[in-house]
Amino acid sequence: MGPVMPPSKKPESPGISVSSGLSQCYRGSSFSKALQEDDDLDFSLPDIRLEEGAMEDEELTNLNWLHESKNLLKSFGDSVLRSVSPVQDLDDDTPPSPAHSDMPYDARQNPNCKPPYSFSCLIFMAIEDSPTKRLPVKDIYNWILEHFPYFANAPTGWKNSVRHNLSLNKCFKKVDKERSQSIGKGSLWCIDPEYRQNLIQALKKTPYHSHSNVFNTPPASPQAYQSTSGPPIWPGSTFFKRNGALLQDPDIDAASAMMLLNTPPEIQAGFPPGVIQNGARVLSRGLFPGVRPLPITPIGMTAAVRNGLTSCRMRTESEPSCGSPVVSGDPKEDHNYSSAKSSHARSTSPASDCVSSSSADDHYEFATKGGQEGSEGSFQSHESHSETEEDDRKCSPKEAKDALGDSGYASQHKKRQHFAKARKVPSDTLPLKKRRTEKPPESDDEEMKEAAGSLLHLAGIRSCLNNITNRTAKGQKEQKETTKN
């Protein structure tokens, strides 16, 4: 590297500064002499290299003189350039402002000097200096005037700035005043615990002050700060915060339910009693004696319970009518079709279904025989009766399905299924709270029960009558053949 001009050596003028800096690099050359004689000399580097061909390349790239010649920008005589210059003026003797100095600020020594704190920091110091950590606006004014005499003679606009910071800054929040306090008009202001660390960091960036030493360390425990700054904050209280916002009671229910889903069971045991149970906040009986929590029912449970009796009385088309007993709402109208046989008949084989249907059809056979005793006496013989029993045992589900279709039960069953779906859809679209409070119409359910029972009863009677007529026709035909033989 080439020679460097020492910092102690200062040029007398801008022109001399530039020429002397370049002369140190090119000693004894014609270029240094030309700098002193003619100021209009061309400073092109190709000409310099032609004149000094034997000079080393390192001296050509030496630009240390630019750092030493600090008066280059001042030679233009423009104050704006001096203000935006990146080069620091080491000879400037103007006293620095307190905000940019490392010296501590003292309001007693400089009462007319503006404090280097923002209004949010002033409000923060005023509130933290109070024993209750809460102050009205007028007490904040008095604290600032007491500790910073500058604002006594300052324009009155600083009070508006304090009020604007209180209302617009998220770090401060308004709290309700107690009845025992007599502060007059206005509200109490306190520090939001969530933004307290932000204010402490902002206060640390300002010069040291005797009032800021208490804010450098956070409180010993969050409970100690909450006991002085406001009511306790836990997941079930009305002041519970989520993402920096105060939640009201409806929001607390949803937020606490989501917290319960994301919280391990061992942590859930530490929640206060009555906060979260089954995904909903349970109200305390002592605080609200007339309020009782509603039980949590899954979606669609109310509609399922409402339509449970109707759906259980419906029979699908795949089930044979001869094997499934007719269900009636009244035990007296059961006609020997008990509901206990329904589960047993569906779990057994089709052969057992036919046996049960034959025994059931025998009851109707006896009733019809009593009416036809005078006209057809030949059906009382033991031979014809045994043959009809064997035919009943050979019945198949396909014949039963045909009998069911003849009775018109299939069309009625489809209509009833469509009606049940139409009733189920609006109830499922209702909100959960309305679904809890909504009661199913009992009159409609009773009508549907009676209609379903009567239709099933008529379908069973008609299918049985068809079987009886078929058996009687077969018996007559066989009897005629036997008489002819």
From Swiss-Prot:
Cross-referenced CDD domains: FH_FOXN3
What residues bear Phosphoserine in this entry?
A: S83, S85, S97, S443
What are the record's GO terms for cellular component? nucleus
Provide a Gene Ontology MF annotation, just one: DNA-binding transcription factor activity
Per the annotation, which location comes first and is thus the protein's main one? nucleus
Lineage top rank: taxon: Eukaryota
UniProt biased composition (Basic residues): 412-424
An example Gene Ontology biological process: regulation of DNA-templated transcription
Protein name in UniProt: Forkhead box protein N3
Q: Say which species the protein is native to.
A: Sus scrofa
What does the organism's lineage look like at the top? Answer: Eukaryota, Metazoa, Chordata, Craniata, Vertebrata
